[in-house]
C-alpha cells in the first residue's frame, strides 16, 4: 500500500467552531478525515486563504493531535473572488501543475466536501482530467447526536467498469 496524501480546502464554515475544547464535540470534516480508524493519512495538504490563517493553524494542530503520524502541509491559495470559476480553476490548475505528484509512489485523495461549490466543482474537473491524479474523497457527519468522527467515501472516476 502506497503512502496516502489527502489534498483539500480548509472549510471556513464546516471546520470552524469555537476555539475552546467544545470544538471536539463537533464534526469538522478536515480533522475527521484524520480520525478515521480505517484511513491512514500520511500527508495532508491543506489549501487555505490568508484570511483564514488562524483557523488553519488550529485545524493543523488538531490534526497533529489526533494523528501524529500525519504530516500537515499548509498551502496558501488566495482568491480575489472564491466564487469566480475562471479564477478558482486557473489557480487550482497552477497548483496541480506545480505540485510534485508521483502516482507510482503515492496515492492521492482529493477532498471535495469543503471549499466553495465553485472550488468543489473545479477539484472534480481537475481530478477527472487527471491534473490531480487521485480519487475523490467525500465526508459527511454521522446521524444522531453530534460527534467529531463522520463517514468517508472514496470515489473513483474510472468509468470503464460501466462499459459493456
Residue ranges with predicted function:
Residues 1-109, 116-164:
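Long, low-complexity, Lys/Arg-enriched
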Amino acid at each position: 500500500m502506497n503512502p496516502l496524501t489527502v489534498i483539500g480546502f480548509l472549510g471556513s464554515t464546516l471546520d470552524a467552531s469555537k476555539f475552546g475544547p467544545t470544538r471536539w464535540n463537533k464534526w469538522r470534516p478536515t480533522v475527521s478525515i484524520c480520525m478515521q480508524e480505517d484511513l491512514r493519512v500520511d500527508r495532508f495538504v491543506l489549501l487555505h486563504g490568508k484570511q483564514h490563517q488562524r483557523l488553519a493553524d488550529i485545524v493543523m494542530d488538531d490534526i497533529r493531535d489526533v494523528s501524529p503520524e500525519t504530516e500537515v502541509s499548509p498551502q496558501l491559495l488566495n482568491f480575489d473572488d472564491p466564487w469566480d470559476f475562471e479564477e478558482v480553476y486557473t489557480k487550482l490548475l497552477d497548483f496541480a501543475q506545480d505540485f510534485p505528484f508521483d502516482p507510482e509512489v503515492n496515492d492521492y485523495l482529493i477532498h471535495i466536501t469543503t471549499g466553495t461549490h465553485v472550488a468543489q466543482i473545479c477539484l472534480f474537473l481537475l481530478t477527472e482530467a487527471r491534473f490531480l491524479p487521485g480519487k475523490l474523497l467525500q465526508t459527511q457527519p454521522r446521524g444522531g447526536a453530534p460527534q467529531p468522527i463522520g463517514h468517508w467515501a472514496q470515489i473513483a472516476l474510472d468509468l470503464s467498469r460501466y462499459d459493456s
